[in-house]
Amino acid sequence: MLPSARIEAVIELTAQVAHSLGENGPAADVLVRKYFSSRRYAGSKDRRRVTNLLYDIIRCWGFLSDISGSDPRRMVMAELHLSDDDPKKYFTGDTHAPENFSDAELEFLETVSAGKEEHHRLNYPKWLESKLQDRFGDKFFQEMNALNKRAPLTLRIARDAPKITEYLVDKKIQYEKGIHANSAIIIKDQVQIRDWPIYRNGLVEIQDEAAQLAVKYVELKPGQQVMDLCAGAGGKSLAAAGYMKNKGQIYAFDISENRLKDLKVRARRAKHHIFQSFVLTPKNRSAKLGEFKEKMDRVILDVPCSGSGTWRRNPENRWRLRQESLGEYINIQRSLMKEAWDAVKIGGRVAYMTCSVFKDENESQIEWFLIEHENANLIPIRKQGIEQLEGTLQLSPFSRGTDGFFVAILEKQAIKT
């Protein structure tokens, strides 16, 4: 693709993202995959250039849509202009290139300058300002700038670490070891790993270092009975199986059959065989979970949340979040915490996790739970992140170079009579 054709592709995808944000439709990565699946002539460099520019636009969506009236052409023009890349060389009207500027668009371009309001400069919805400032305090600017950067590709070593490093060195792939989790490898190059033998054969999995560290604090051991109540595609379950050395049982629950199918594929690839998976529905949920009442040594509870800690890799999430949906998440989280508590045995532990930086979803939920359950004891986690409820862990991009992630470990004690 010629450079001007790439810009035309970005305009088309920007329009699709705008529609998707308005209708709560598919995520940007889904739209990009679909777009290029019907354009086989586009090479890997084309896809990378288009995707990178599109995601730069998504990060600044609030500001760009405000100044452009949500017009996709103007949003792309403005992003190019603000990046010191002259848009006039792309908008030529040539074959496969965007049409020439209209007089109105030329006038618009002359008015474009960097955002002056804080929520425009730091790329967050205005209504979230107090929550973000409450969380980050005097590190607000540093943390928000970190959330605006692209996240690196982080891998978890599943097995055979020497083979992994040998492969990376042989392929001249730049990497460094994680700082917080021994299992983490951070890839410095922009790569596609789906065809790597070490990935296809289950030696590595894609997982942010924060999530790897969170599983470490669950203190898993061989032979335990473990429930993953919101398993999804099984990232944390697979990490748990490694700590358990394939001994014991992991019961993976989710409301999505497709996600659990992914877990089964990944488990086979990683040579883990201690999984049982269960699809939960409104009809079977109570009865199915009732079968596990007070039988679990550990419950991993990575609850649905705002995803505010993942804005580096999912920048559109900041624009999808609505005030009412945050309240819904909080109610869902409390319901799931009760279900997890019913499943864990006396002396067992629930590991509450979110990929959020908001106190409403993190410390406030733990404080509520401790008040509601007199037999719940908060097991202290050594402080490694930013300011937080004593005994819990809150990681963030600036403080620790990871996704924003929260962990609290709750131990179930016998009720005193």
Each model region followed by its residue ranges:
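Class I Rossmann-like S-adenosyl-L-methionine
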Residues: M1-R194
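Glycine-rich S-adenosyl-L-methionine
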Residues: E129-S130, I255-D262, N317-K345
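SAM-dependent Rossmann-like transferase core, predominantly class I methyltransferases
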Residues: I187-Q225
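Conserved class I S-adenosyl-L-methionine
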Residues: G223-C230, Y251
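Conserved SAM-binding loop of SAM-dependent methyltransferases across substrates and taxa
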Residues: A233-N246
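Helix-to-beta-strand junctions that scaffold the AdoMet/dcAdoMet cofactor pocket
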Residues: M244-K245, V344-I346
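S-adenosyl-L-methionine
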Residues: S256-E294
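C-terminal catalytic and target-recognition region of SAM-dependent MTase-like enzymes
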Residues: K283-S306, R312, G327, R334, ...
